[in-house]
C-alpha cells in the first residue's frame, strides 16, 4: 500500500486500499496514509498532506462504505504528488548528531538568562535581527541538516528562501546587533 503510493502507482494503491476497506481496518489505513503523506510526499506537496488528514477525518466521520471516497481521493492525490523526503532526512541528520554529541543551548536562548547583561539577552521585540542570531551551539554553527529536494515548486521556493537566509552572517554576539 505505502510502497504503491511512494512509487506513484495509483491503481495498485487503490487496490490495496480496497483490501483494507474490506477488512474494515480503518486504523491501519489511517496510520499508513499519515506516515506515507508525511514521510514520502512531505514538502513535495504539503497541501496534499493536509488534504490527506482531512480525508481521513471525513472517512472516519461517515464510516464505510462512503468513507472509501475521501480515502480514494487522498490516495490519488498522494500518488500523483511530487515526493520529498527532505524533512525526514533533515530530522534524521539532526538526531544523528545529537546521539554522538552533547552541546549546551546558548545562554541567550534559555527561557530565563541568569546573570546576563541586558544587551546580551535575546530581544523578543526585535524581529529585524532574529535571522542574524546564531541559534545552534558554537560547535555546530555551520551545520546544515536540511537539504531541499527540488521536486516541486513549493520546495523550490523554500530553497530560495533558505539560500538567502544562509547568506546572512549569524552571530552569537547579541550586543553587536543592538
Provide a role label for each language-model segment:
Residues 1-7:
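A short helix-loop-helix "switch/interaction" segment in the helical subdomain of ASCE P-loop NTPases
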Residues 7-130, 137-178:
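Terminal-proximal interaction/regulatory segments of ATP-powered molecular machines
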Amino acid at each position: 500500500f505505502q510502497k504503491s503510493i511512494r512509487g506513484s502507482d495509483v491503481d495498485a494503491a487503490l487496490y490495496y486500499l480496497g483490501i483494507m476497506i474490506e477488512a474494515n481496518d480503518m486504523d491501519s489505513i489511517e496510520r499508513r496514509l499519515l506516515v506515507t503523506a508525511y514521510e514520502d510526499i512531505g514538502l513535495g506537496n504539503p497541501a496534499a498532506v493536509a488534504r490527506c488528514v482531512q480525508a481521513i477525518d471525513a472517512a472516519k466521520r461517515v464510516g464505510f462504505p462512503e468513507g472509501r471516497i475521501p480515502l480514494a481521493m487522498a490516495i490519488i492525490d498522494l500518488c500523483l504528488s511530487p515526493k520529498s523526503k527532505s524533512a525526514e532526512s533533515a530530522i534524521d541528520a539532526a538526531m544523528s548528531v545529537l546521539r554522538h554529541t552533547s552541546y549546551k543551548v546558548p545562554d541567550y536562548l534559555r527561557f530565563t538568562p541568569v546573570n546576563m547583561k541586558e544587551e546580551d539577552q535575546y530581544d523578543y521585540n526585535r524581529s529585524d535581527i532574529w535571522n542574524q542570531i546564531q541559534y545552534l551551539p558554537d560547535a555546530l554553527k555551520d551545520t546544515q541538516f536540511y537539504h531541499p529536494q527540488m521536486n516541486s515548486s513549493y520546495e523550490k521556493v523554500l530553497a530560495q528562501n533558505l539560500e538567502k537566509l544562509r547568506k546572512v552572517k549569524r552571530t552569537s554576539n547579541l550586543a553587536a546587533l543592538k
